Amino acid sequence: MLSDQVTTAELHPSAPLTECETGIYHTFCPISCVAWLYQRVEDSFFLVIGTKTCGYFLQNALGVMIFAEPRYAMAELEEGDISAQFNDYHELRRLCVQIQQDRHPSVIVWIGTCTTEIIKMDLEGMAPTLQAEIGIPIVVARANGLDYAFTQGEDTVLAAMAQRCPDWTPDRTATQSTSSPPLVIFGSVPATVVSQLTFELQRQKVEVTGWLPSARYADLPAVGEDVYACGVNPFLSRTAITLMRRRRCKMIGSPFPIGPDGTRAWIEKICHVFGLETTGLAERERQVWSQLEDYLSLVRGKSAFLMGDNLLEISLARFLIRCGMIVHEVGIPYMDARFQAAELHLLMRTCEAAHVPMPRIVTKPDNFYQVQRMRDVQPDLAITGMAHANPLEARGTGTKWSVELTFWQLHGFASAKDLLELVTRPLRRTH
């Protein structure tokens, strides 16, 4: 169950209501998650099983040259595969044996695509047999374009990896040096952010027993009934459900550590659940904000419009409002209101403290109507997908690609300056 979980109805008498539109939605395909996940799991190899279109996307959109030899590849489905003329198992076995000989990974991750869904390819059935034959773990994740947003590809992969985590046993507690319960943090972030967030929690006497994903597959954290889990990204609701229902972890429902305010709230919530008093956290946040004054003076009083692309929009809106901006609308492809309840609560409190109205929250936004609303409010900054950036720039609105925020360091106290540096670039350009 969610520890101290706040439901939407409990947030406030005037709790934020989300509107839902049904417009055509434009985003990257979730198979793009391999671009950052293969860097996080250093001994992995990702095999995307799809069509030529998937291969073109990975090669062109992600900007990776063939000679760079990244640790992911395409298993291209041909006419014979789709018409069942070829044996899927034999073809995948041939590829996995070649990967084993050439790259020596500790784990192979099969990424299913739209085509494998449509032709009902039994990846989950083939993987156990093949991994027993070649002696390498094979994790199956269906990160296809049927999801709402491309970041949900990571959610699918982490949910699959959560099933492979070892079981937590009580005797493991004997090795812990602190009195805090075992805690697993889930979400893919750079190694520097892992170190920073782990250090911040250690300063509050909270010991992190593991991260999902881990840098090495063999180091996946142990999970079970006595283990608490907490996420760092708002698009990981499927992973949270897997950890709660399948692995019986206790989920800590918290805001996400994006921006100094979010990082402080994230740490405070974990400490509150563990019955610990925080020390020096408010002063730590104040120091960070004071160091950002040059950027804050640039954004203060400016307005923003988030069209919606990567499910980070609620957290980003809260951070921008805390920086002194006015956010007119938050478009978001999909929102798990239960998983983001604490973040919504923090957004409301931030708006109340800043004496600004709550932004309009629209799920599955219709881009045509969004552009009309944007024309009415004339925002200074639009955080948008790549498809709309140039037209909006031509109309005089500064834009920032939301996909850049996905690859940027957003989490923790130390990343606040980098985040503002990225967001303020279009404002400095037009200033």
From Swiss-Prot:
Binds 1 [4Fe-4S] cluster per heterodimer. The cluster is bound at the heterodimer interface by residues from both subunits. It is found in: Plastid, Chloroplast. It catalyses: chlorophyllide a + oxidized 2[4Fe-4S]-[ferredoxin] + 2 ADP + 2 phosphate = protochlorophyllide a + reduced 2[4Fe-4S]-[ferredoxin] + 2 ATP + 2 H2O. Keywords: 4Fe-4S, ATP-binding, Chlorophyll biosynthesis, Chloroplast, Iron, Iron-sulfur, Metal-binding, Nucleotide-binding, Oxidoreductase, Photosynthesis, Plastid. The keyword Plastid applies. Pathway: Porphyrin-containing compound metabolism; chlorophyll biosynthesis (light-independent). This is Light-independent protochlorophyllide reductase subunit N. InterPro entries: LIPOR_BchN/ChlN, Nase/OxRdtase_comp1, Protochl_reductN.
